[in-house]
Amino acid sequence: MGKVVGIDLGTTNSVVAVMEGGKPVVIANAEGMRTTPSVVGFSKDGERVVGQMARRQTVLNPQNTFFAVKRYIGRRYNELSPESKRVPYTIRKDEVGNIKVACPRLNKEFSAEEISAMVLKKLADDASAYLGSAVTGAVITVPAYFNDSQRQATRDAGRIAGLEVLRILNEPTAASLAYGLDRGDTETILVFDLGGGTFDVSILEVGDGVFEVKATSGDTQLGGNDFDKKIVDWLAEQFLETEGVDLRRDRQALQRLMEAAEKAKIELSAVSITDINLPFITATEDGPKHLETRLTRSQFEGLCVDLLGRVRNPVKRALKDAGLRPDDIEEVVLVGGSTRMPMVKQLVRDLIGIEPSENVNPDEVVAMGAAIQAGILAGEFKDVLLLDVTPLSLGLEAIGGVMKKLIPRNTTIPVRRSDIFSTSENNQNSVEIHVVQGEREMAGDNKSLGRFKLYGIPPAPRGIPQIQVAFDIDANGILQVTALDRTTGREQSITIQGASTLSESEVNRMIQEAQKYADVDRERKERVEKRTRSEALILQGERQLREVALEFGMQFARNRRQRIDNISRELKESLKENDDRGIDQAYADLQDALYELNREVRQYYAEDEDDDLFATIKDIFVGDKDKERDLPRDSYRERDAYNNRDYGRDYGRDYGRDSRPSYDNSRPPRKSPRPSYQDNWDDDDDWL
């Protein structure tokens, strides 16, 4: 069985962690970073890039670079606000009302699940490289306030990425696992999770291995990106007033504004004033235009007053649902990078009355909690009990369009609830079950999760047939609905997949496409690595030829050196023509030729050492009357090594050797110290 990891699939950044030695460990990605930007892009040649590489191309390639797609996962196009649609890439509605992002580079449209799957695949591959074995399973976290469609969509993203999703875990609950795993005393904590695109607040009782969620609340459309957009609008309005140009209408300028806004937001968490300079942001008939301004922390906080109000309400609602007062909260755990903003920390102090805990890394704690949950499922932890809740009420549409609630919000899961319903008309032979989720009294004002019909009801007056409808929520928070005609025993059930999620056939198609992409990516990576190895070998060969020529002269191993030079030219030509077979053949030939040259050099030195040994024996028994050995070596180097070699040694004397190989009928002098010509393709110099 493959490895199982915990993944925090974030709006802005994602993190992967694994259990090692009973402790959660965050895994660095291939670029060496502990967080991976949740960004997917397609370069000018159609190559897919994920993470930091994709983020680097956002300004130059905004239409083919996709970020913050977590805000669209599991949602319908008509549910989006105008603010949510204001991104540099194109968002469209498909034939059933789902959200698609357009990729002009490939002339193709992707669902949010597919883009998220590419991020998950990147995280899983990096984790596999770290662990040394394939990652096949994952615990993936979602905002606590995600509805059923969004949870299903996240699970589908994991399947498309080739992962077995063992559990969908709420982010605040995951954070509480990482925070309270080793704590013995029971305490009431509030997890305040403000990420890049979502906001959650959960109240839990933690202690002695029990993690019980008392209440949860939040806003899936509120996060750090909204704070960034306040700065974007402020900058754009200033520029519009002074230059008469709305930068938000230019995709590239909008992307630069968004990056500058995020940078300014981060800086204002540490300083009270920041400079924003964007040269050549646009051009008019008068020439290029630059954006230069200053933003103070107080100005920024003034821009975000309404957002702070949206943060305040879920906290109050969670306290009310849990039946607690602020004084009952013993610890506040901050999760998400946006909680670093001073105004957010101050808001928490004002609401709860205590200083937030600084004991956890807000960027990594959720992934670490997911890894702990993976360890629980694998049996690594025996005495841990996790009791989560459903964030929103679940019910169905009854007569008159009202919502009949079967499972109220903040009900501990897993849970099963049922109720008896009947027909609204005489001789009605079928009933439609319309499942909704939300807190409004009318079904039409809530989120529609799906519809299905129960057929074959015997004719009877209205109100006589008895239809039992049961709601089952599993530990992942995913709903299954069953309708049973108690008269006939006929049953119909459905795992809710609302119109905003993918059908099974679509998921299977995307899995196949993801595998095709994986194969293409692997082949492209192999070609790049092959080219890099070949270029390094060519440079190694050229360097070695120069050193051999300088050390032994131009006549030493002349034929071998000429062959190496010819093969190097062949390899360069194959690289230029992208001839894979030619590259493979020339690479192997060049390796063999360099090996033979190295062998000849080593053989020469071995024989020269024999000469030194016999000369020493001669000196011991005969003496060195001519003092020729006292001559400086520099005098030898000034001579032509291949004409009348006289090195102060009697080469006519037999020292017991039967034969000596000839190297082009000449023997160059040996230099000291002896250089090493062992093949070492990992030397840093090989890559210069």
UniProtKB/Swiss-Prot annotation:
Span of the signal peptide: none
InterPro entries for this protein: ATPase_NBD (IPR043129), Chaperone_DnaK (IPR012725), Heat_shock_70_CS (IPR018181), HSP70_peptide-bd_sf (IPR029047), Hsp_70_fam (IPR013126)
Induction: By stress conditions e.g. heat shock.
Biased composition (Basic and acidic residues): 630-661
SUPFAM superfamilies with a match to the protein in the record: Actin-like ATPase domain, Heat shock protein 70kD (HSP70), peptide-binding domain
CDD domains from the UniProt entry: ASKHA_NBD_HSP70_DnaK-like
UniProtKB keywords: ATP-binding, Chaperone, Nucleotide-binding, Phosphoprotein, Stress response
Pfam families: HSP70
Region ranges (Disordered): 630-688
Family affiliation: Belongs to the heat shock protein 70 family.
Name of this protein: Chaperone protein dnaK1
Organism: Nostoc sp. (strain PCC 7120 / SAG 25.82 / UTEX 2576)
